[in-house]
């Protein structure tokens, strides 16, 4: 097993070979020290957001084959620092991450006192007006103030009036210091005279409204049917019917010239006159104007602020009863309120903690693993056979233990028949690669299936002495009857097999009724369910049809019959006769071998495997040379033989590149591609890969990948911007009120018609048969 180790800045990456799942983090540090010249004490290793600590194995952190572990080098510690202080210093400075606030910051109230004083002054609505001697407005006067970001008007009060030099060098400008009544957290805001005006107080009657008038209206740009904020608007037209009155206007968004045209004003009875500067009638007129607090609508859209209605949104999230506000806690995560006596268990007093989280939002601190702490015990791994085994054998070096690095998503796991893009004769070095390709999903088990559905694939590895392999047909022995306790992979037959689990699944593939007593034979065996067959090199000693190395996909077979009999071990076993039923030639035939050459099929290795093997061989050669030099000899050292030199020296010249047979499209497929005019550019890109043979299918998969689900598009919607998305994915996006293309954010509009691209769906179904299963 091998992994990649990369520095945090990404500048240096090295492969660490000869690892096991049981390799300790301490041992890994030693190997990293040799490659990066960094002492183990200065190494901080991270994998998937977790800091790897000594005492654990890489299996504890679920590190997979060829995965990347990040290395952060600690700064060299000064010699004067005591060892007990070392850890405390490294926690913040070396990681490059900021820690919590300092004590001085926590105790600081700078910035809050101004807001609190502003809020306190806001409570004195009856304060006397003070004339500053310049400007239209007095201190403590109620006005309407514009928010410069939104362009909307809000109720405010002037707290200070000052002068500032004009930008053009003319007369001094007057600056009004105002605070918004409903938003005290904004503090005091400085505004020019054009952004402040007397509090609106005059409501226009219907007959007074005329096109071209500039008025003040309530409008919600996000949801026009709901109550929003107050904007200036120019009336464009009005219409009156027997049942309703409608006003349409242009919403003015500040002085920048931005506007929203032809907007329907929902609240026609709340259209206000814009007061001119200096037109305030007196101190009481502004504060008692119709435009007062609450004019932006009820705070709770569920209960409409009805005090008689219970509401779990604006009040206690458990009982919803509007009482005891002094005994309510507000969750700092979800902003929901909870009565102290409604919690489970109930609280007798309000907690002193600054932050409080409800039971749904709270994270259990005991389950959080902090940097420098050991991992918590995993219940799942505690149940594994390896956890309770007393064996000292290192089981973590096998390729069956490394886990998949990718997963086949072209077809579902319960797919019958060939996997698109995997021709007969495909070779893999390890079983885990067969699993990644989707041909045979289990890493170790010989049969993949479901006892209530059937078997999808099997591996012929010569594991049972009763197996007989004749190439186009073979007799297969079922699974079970062996004691595999203690994490064993194989054992001698120790009891009778039963027609259950995978044995029953394989029996369901036979075109005959299931008989768990005597077995059954199909009258028309070709009508049975197909089984993908993989032959392993482990069966080479029993069968000449097995590959010399690795695992080979040999095509589709079908179950002819199955029956119980006494095996060579003396126990009852279930036998299955399978015959080949595939259009592609078998890989051991002349035609099959020629096809393999034409398709350019060679052994497939895991990523980084060849480099790891080469490095291991080089290390072994260097070690042998060192041993020879250290061995005392009387004469001169013998010269290497010619055969050894040829073996060690690299092959001269580049190997001749084999010509791969091009992928052939049927006339129907070519016609469908031609009909898909919307994706002509993408098809032109994909068609360039026809010369690569089976890799053409992989190219099509890459080109027509849905950006949302990362699978081949199903029921594809080709958008205006020439992107393809699954209809279900786009519907989910629209349901979340996101009306843009998931790929480029082009605005599709709320009423976008989702028409399925039928030619594209048809060609994808032919290239990837069965990929639509489970996606309806």
Curated annotation (Swiss-Prot):
Membrane-spanning parts: none
Organism (species): Danio rerio
Record keyword Oxidoreductase present: no
Domain notes: The tudor-like regions specifically recognize and bind histone H3 unmethylated at 'Arg-2' (H3R2me0), while the PHD-type zinc finger specifically recognizes and binds histone H3 trimethylated at 'Lys-9' (H3K9me3). The YDG domain (also named SRA domain) specifically recognizes and binds hemimethylated DNA at replication forks (DNA that is only methylated on the mother strand of replicating DNA).
Binding-site positions, DNA: 461-462, 467
Protein name: E3 ubiquitin-protein ligase UHRF1
Tissue specificity annotation: Expressed in proliferating tissues. Highly expressed 24-48 hours after fertilization (hpf) in rapidly proliferating tissues, including the tectum, retina and brachial arches. Preferentially expressed in the liver bud and expression is maintained in the fully developed liver. Also expressed in the proximal gut. In adult, the highest expression is detected in testis.
Residue numbers marked as site, Required to discriminate between hemimethylated DNA versus symmetrically methylated DNA: 487
């Amino acid at each position: 097993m091998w992994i990649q180790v990369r520095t945090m800045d990404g500048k240096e990456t090295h492969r660490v070979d000869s690892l096991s799942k049981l390799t300790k983090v301490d041992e890994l540090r030693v190997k990293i020290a040799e490659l990066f010249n960094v002492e183990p004490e200065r190494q901080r290793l991270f994998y998937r957001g977790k800091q790897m600590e000594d005492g654990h194995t890489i299996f504890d952190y679920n590190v997979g084959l060829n995965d990347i572990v990040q290395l952060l080098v600690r700064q060299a510690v000064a010699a004067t620092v005591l060892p007990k202080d070392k850890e405390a210093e490294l926690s913040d400075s070396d990681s490059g991450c900021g820690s919590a606030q300092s004590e001085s910051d926590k105790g600081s109230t700078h910035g809050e006192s101004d807001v609190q004083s502003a809020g306190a002054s806001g409570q004195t609505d009856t304060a006397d007006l003070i004339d500053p001697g310049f400007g239209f407005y007095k201190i403590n006067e109620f006005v309407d103030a514009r928010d410069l970001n939104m362009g909307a008007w809000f109720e405010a009060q002037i707290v200070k009036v000052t002068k500032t030099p004009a930008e053009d060098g003319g007369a001094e400008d007057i600056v009004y210091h105002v605070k918004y009544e409903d938003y005290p957290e904004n503090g005091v805001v400085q505004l020019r005279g054009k952004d402040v005006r007397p509090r609106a107080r005059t409501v226009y009657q219907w007959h007074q409204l005329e096109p071209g008038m500039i008025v003040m209206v309530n409008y919600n740009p996000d949801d026009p049917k709901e109550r929003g904020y107050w904007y200036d608007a120019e009336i464009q037209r009005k219409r009156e019917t027997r049942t309703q009155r409608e006003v349409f206007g242009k919403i003015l968004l500040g002085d920048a010239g931005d506007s929203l045209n032809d907007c329907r004003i929902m609240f026609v009875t709340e259209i206000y006159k814009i007061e001119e500067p200096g037109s305030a009638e007196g101190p009481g007129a502004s504060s008692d104007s119709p435009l007062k607090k609450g004019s932006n609508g009820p705070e709770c859209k569920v209960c409409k602020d009805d005090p008689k209605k219970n509401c779990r949104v604006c009040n206690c999230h458990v009982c919803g009863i509007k009482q005891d506000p002094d005994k309510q806690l507000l969750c700092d995560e979800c902003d929901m309120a909870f009565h102290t006596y409604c919690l489970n268990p109930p609280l007798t007093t309000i907690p002193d903690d600054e932050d409080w989280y409800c039971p749904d939002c709270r994270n259990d601190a005991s389950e959080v693993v902090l940097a420098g702490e050991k991992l918590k015990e995993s219940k799942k791994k505690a149940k594994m056979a390896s956890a309770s085994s007393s064996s000292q054998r290192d089981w973590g070096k096998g390729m069956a233990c490394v886990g998949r690095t990718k997963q086949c998503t072209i077809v579902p796991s319960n797919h019958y028949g060939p996997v698109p893009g995997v021709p007969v004769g495909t070779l893999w070095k390890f079983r885990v690669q067969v699993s990644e390709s989707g041909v045979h999903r289990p890493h170790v088990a010989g049969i993949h299936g479901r006892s209530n559905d059937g078997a999808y694939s099997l591996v012929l590895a010569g594991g049972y002495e009763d197996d007989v392999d004749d190439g186009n047909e073979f007799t297969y022995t079922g699974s079970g009857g062996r004691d595999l306790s203690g994490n064993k992979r194989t054992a001698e037959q120790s009891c009778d097999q039963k027609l259950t689990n995978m044995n029953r699944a394989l029996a369901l593939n036979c075109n005959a009724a299931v008989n768990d007593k005597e077995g059954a034979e199909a009258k028309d065996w070709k009508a049975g369910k197909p089984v993908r067959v993989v032959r392993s090199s482990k069966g080479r000693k029993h069968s000449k049809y097995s590959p010399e190395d690795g695992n080979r996909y040999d095509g589709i077979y079908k179950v002819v019959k199955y029956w119980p009999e006494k095996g060579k071990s003396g126990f009852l076993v279930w036998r299955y006769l399978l015959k080949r039923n595939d259009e592609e030639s078998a890989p051991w035939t002349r035609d099959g071998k020629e096809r393999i050459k034409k398709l350019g099929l060679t052994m497939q290795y895991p990523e980084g495997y060849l480099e790891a093997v080469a490095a291991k061989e080089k290390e072994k050669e260097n070690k042998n040379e060192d041993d020879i030099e250290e061995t005392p000899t009387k004469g001169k050292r013998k010269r290497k033989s010619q055969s050894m030199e040829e073996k060690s020296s690299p092959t001269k010249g580049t190997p001749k590149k084999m010509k791969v047979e091009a992928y052939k499209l049927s006339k129907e497929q070519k016609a469908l591609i031609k009909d898909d005019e919307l994706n002509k550019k993408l098809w032109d890109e994909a068609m360039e890969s026809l010369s690569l043979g089976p890799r053409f299918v992989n190219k099509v998969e890459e080109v027509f990948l849905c950006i949302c689900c990362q699978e081949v598009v199903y029921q594809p919607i080709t958008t205006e911007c020439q992107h393809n998305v699954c209809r279900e994915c786009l519907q989910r996006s629209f349901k979340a009120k996101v009306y843009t293309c998931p790929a480029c954010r082009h605005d599709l509009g709320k009423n976008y018609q989702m028409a399925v691209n039928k030619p594209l769906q048809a060609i994808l179904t032919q290239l990837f048969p069965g990929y639509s299963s489970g996606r309806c």
